[in-house]
């Protein structure tokens, strides 16, 4: 039911939080005339809007249709646009047109609007309208399909969803130079003003792929040979053909197509085929859809493949192909066979994950991931955590219905390309299958849009029924079959993650445990490679779920902002009770859950400390930071990963154990990984933490207030500590080399020699401002 006029007026008053002149006419409702003393409009700036050159917003009498307008100031930089926005719930469903008056002194070429709607704040961006110099009215049709979203892979052709639940309204200016444009009289209209400027028409291509609708029983099935020479531990893609046609090729009850692979030693692998649609780089369907199978041979020699249809029962001619040995291949990631607290490849090499969350892209997906992966790989990174969320790579949402992924083939193809980018750069993907918001009504809630919700045509009255309802479970098993068939063959799939932070949903551990057991059995049926499984909570170590044999390793998430050394050490001990000897990772880390303060912490101290604290407190890799797209990448913080990678290169951590260290001052903390003849040491000043930064900042502000002076530009410099002594115990007596490393400068220092006596090594640090690491190795 639509709101009445006075309800709309109240919403707008809340939006602007200032007196608003609202004029109800037959054809218009004025949203903002900018006649008040203040405005809630703001410039979109980095890190949240890293692609925006917006500078400031100011009320002005210049170029106003009434007494005042608002000036939107920007610069012309390498960023292509300037974003200005207001955030507050608005109902924009009352009229079909959004109009405003704009004066352009000649500093802007185009303008577009963007609306974030619904509980997930889905960003809808319009086509842009060309601007002339001088005064003009600009109009946007709110009901048309000239918008693009992440759901449409940023291709125009979708309408705005949930106009009545608009959370953010933004103007996107395309500058031609430094300056400003002047905005006034923002309004909803039922008819477009004569002579108004409107967006340029965009071409919305008609897909060339024809959806499968009719049915025909299969009488033939065939399999094509590999298009490229097959190599051990390299995934193959084989084409399949059948004359069978079904209404839904994603439903194996309608057409169950599998391929039986037989290895040189007689091992049999039954792999499900999947329905595939190729796309062009412009994300348009490329040719007709069809069947494929993906498989990674683990043995060299002669293999046999044969396609099989279950109903009707048909088999193809057997195909024989040769697989060449691949001595350089490391294989799949496993739990380390010699030390279950770490990971290893099939060939025995240690896998030490260094990376971060790169969960999704809200821009040009492939360009973003190529840039992120290039920068991560160039700095020694080798892991990324990616979500199959509704706005990114999910196969099933309210635009698909349940069990038919036809409308999400673009997302599947994009995820193919992301895997390819990762494989080319030595990056391994933790693939998160379910995000909490999809089944939450409180934290990042998306339940109202979930296709399993009875309100949207599903079968579930409550989110927690997803893990108990038999129909929902069977539909999810169908999705798992498709996911396993399409991506399970990749050796660069590090792990399947069932849920992200499930504690934000109403699903309890008692409900979850049998579901994980059932779904793990299902997924391993479809992918025989032995991939690892994990799961996550918003904290970490307290749940008995970690004891389940179906979960390969445990995860800690932390946004407390506390010192990672103490937080990680405490959580690690907690995992001893719940996870046994399983590996542990810090799967998410941030200073806060709401964002990072770049201006307060330009050195990214929390990112740095998290990366180093995790392995030195026993975790199997560096902590995986969150804010990748609005903090790490726009501020070029990638080199922090290189320091960790350089220091731990070629280290066999399976022979070392996290060990207490004695430090001569309370102003520093030291942690070590130690064996009998080898130790790795990290010493950090306690002044090099975000807590110390915040405390120093607060003191500086108080001092300025007390002195009644203006608080100007401020930058934190950690205090310098002098003559610190560190003692390691438990080493065998003898001569040792000590090689120092600066994690912040990413450089090696001098090598020195010490003598270990009575099992104790004493190291002296003349001065310490941030942190130092060292390798202590016995001289042969």
What are these regions (language model features)?
Residues 229, 246-247, 591-595, 607-752, ...:
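Aromatic- and carboxylate-lined catalytic core of secreted/periplasmic carbohydrate-active enzymes
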Residues 478, 485, 499-649, 716-719:
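Extracellular glycoside hydrolase catalytic/binding regions
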């Amino acid at each position: 039911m639509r709101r009445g006029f006075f309800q709309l007026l109240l919403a707008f008053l809340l939006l602007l939080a200032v007196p608003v002149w609202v004029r109800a006419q037959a054809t218009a409702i004025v949203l903002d005339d900018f006649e008040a003393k203040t405005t809630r409009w703001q410039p979109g700036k980095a890190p949240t809007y890293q692609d925006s050159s917006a500078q400031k917003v100011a009320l002005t009498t210049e170029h106003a249709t009434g007494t005042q307008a608002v000036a939107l100031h920007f610069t012309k930089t390498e960023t292509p646009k300037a974003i200005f926005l207001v955030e507050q719930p608005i109902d924009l469903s009352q009229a079909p047109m959004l109009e405003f008056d704009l004066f352009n002194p000649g500093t802007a070429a185009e303008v577009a609007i963007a609306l974030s709607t619904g509980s997930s704040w889905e960003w809808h961006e319009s086509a842009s309208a060309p601007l002339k110099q001088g005064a003009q009215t600009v109009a946007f049709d709110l009901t048309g399909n000239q918008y693009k979203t992440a759901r449409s892979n940023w291709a125009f052709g979708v309408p705005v969803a949930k106009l009545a639940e608009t959370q953010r309204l933004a103007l996107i200016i395309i500058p031609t130079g430094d300056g400003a444009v002047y905005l006034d009289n923002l309004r909803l209209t039922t008819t477009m003003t004569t002579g108004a400027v409107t967006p340029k028409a965009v071409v919305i291509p008609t897909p060339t792929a024809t959806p499968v609708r009719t049915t025909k029983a299969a009488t033939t099935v065939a399999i094509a040979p590999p298009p490229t020479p097959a190599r051990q531990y390299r995934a193959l893609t084989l084409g399949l053909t059948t004359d069978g046609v079904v209404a839904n090729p994603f439903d194996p009850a309608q057409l169950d197509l599998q391929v039986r692979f037989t290895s040189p030693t007689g091992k049999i692998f039954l792999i499900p085929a999947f329905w595939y649609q190729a796309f062009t780089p412009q994300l348009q369907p490329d040719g007709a859809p069809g069947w494929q199978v993906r498989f990674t041979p683990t043995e060299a020699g002669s293999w046999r493949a044969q396609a099989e249809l279950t109903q009707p029962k048909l088999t193809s001619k057997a195909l024989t192909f040769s697989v060449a040995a691949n001595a350089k291949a490391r294989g799949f990631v496993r739990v380390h066979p010699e030390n279950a607290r770490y990971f290893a490849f099939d060939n025995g090499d240690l896998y030490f994950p260094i990376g971060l969350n790169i969960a999704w892209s809200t821009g040009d997906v492939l360009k973003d991931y190529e840039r992120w992966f290039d920068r991560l790989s160039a700095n020694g990174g080798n892991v990324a955590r990616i979500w199959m969320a509704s706005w990114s790579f999910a196969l099933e949402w309210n635009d698909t219905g349940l069990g038919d992924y036809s409308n999400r083939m673009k997302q599947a193809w994009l995820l193919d390309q992301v895997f390819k980018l990762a494989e080319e750069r030595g990056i391994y993907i933790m693939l998160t299958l379910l995000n909490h918001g999809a089944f939450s009504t409180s934290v990042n809630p998306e339940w109202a849009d979930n296709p399993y919700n009875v309100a949207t045509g599903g079968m579930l009255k409550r989110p927690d029924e997803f893990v108990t309802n038999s129909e929902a479970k069977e539909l999810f098993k169908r999705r798992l079959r498709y996911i396993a068939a399409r991506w399970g063959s990749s050796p660069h799939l590090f792990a399947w993650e069932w849920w992200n932070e499930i504690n934000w949903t109403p699903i309890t551990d008692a409900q979850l445990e049998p579901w994980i057991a059932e779904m793990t059995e299902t997924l391993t049926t479809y992918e025989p490679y032995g991939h690892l499984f994990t799961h996550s909570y918003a904290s970490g170590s307290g749940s008995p779920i970690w004891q389940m044999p179906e979960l390969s390793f445990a995860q800690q998430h932390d946004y407390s902002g506390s010192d990672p050394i103490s937080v990680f050490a405490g959580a690690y001990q907690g995992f001893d009770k719940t996870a046994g000897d399983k590996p542990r990772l810090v799967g998410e880390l941030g200073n806060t859950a709401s964002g990072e303060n770049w201006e307060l912490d330009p050195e990214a101290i929390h990112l740095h400390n998290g990366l180093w604290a995790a392995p030195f407190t026993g975790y199997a890799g560096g902590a995986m930071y969150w804010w990748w797209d609005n903090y790490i990448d726009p501020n070029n913080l990638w080199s922090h990963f290189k320091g960790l990678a350089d220091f731990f290169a070629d280290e066999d951590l399976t022979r070392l154990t996290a060990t207490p260290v004695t430090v001569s001052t309370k102003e520093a903390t030291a942690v070590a990984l130690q064996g009998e003849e080898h130790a790795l040491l990290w010493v950090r000043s306690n002044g090099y933490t975000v807590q110390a930064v915040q405390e120093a900042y607060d003191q500086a502000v108080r001092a300025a207030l007390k002195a009644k002076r203006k608080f100007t530009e401020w930058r934190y410099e950690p205090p310098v500590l002098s003559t610190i002594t560190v003692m390691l115990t438990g080493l065998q007596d003898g001569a040792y080399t000590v090689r120092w490393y600066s994690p912040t400068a990413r450089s090696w220092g001098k090598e020195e020699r010490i003598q270990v006596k009575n099992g104790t090594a004493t190291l002296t640090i003349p001065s310490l401002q941030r942190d130092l690491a060292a390798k202590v190795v016995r001289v042969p």
